[in-house]
């Protein structure tokens, strides 16, 4: 049995790329934890410390960051075909 990777997505409510990324992961039945950095300042600081990024979305897959909604990289890291 393959364990599901740990996926955390840092977002804001007004980010259209965040909404697209969330929709994509849901379509692929990938469970993820969403962190709204506009409401959680400590999470925003943590995001910047971990990745050097202040923009969203940033998706952590098993603690490896993907900056932006980079579908090919998401597919590669989650072994999603097509």
Where in this protein do the model-derived segments appear?
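Short Fe-S-cluster ligation motifs
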Residues: 42-58
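Thiol-based oxidoreductase modules, predominantly thioredoxin-like and allied folds used
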Residues: 31-43
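Short alpha-helical
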Residues: 16, 42, 73
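A structural signal for short, well-ordered beta-strand elements
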Residues: 11, 33-36, 67
């Amino acid at each position: 049995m393959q364990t599901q990777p740990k996926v955390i997505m840092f977002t804001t409510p007004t980010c259209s790329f965040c909404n697209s990324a969330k929709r994509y992961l849901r379509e692929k039945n990938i469970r993820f934890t969403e962190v709204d950095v506009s409401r959680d300042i400590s999470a925003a600081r943590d995001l910047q410390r971990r990745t050097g990024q202040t923009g969203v979305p940033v998706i952590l897959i098993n603690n490896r960051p993907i900056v932006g909604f980079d579908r090919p990289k998401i597919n590669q890291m989650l072994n999603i075909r097509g």
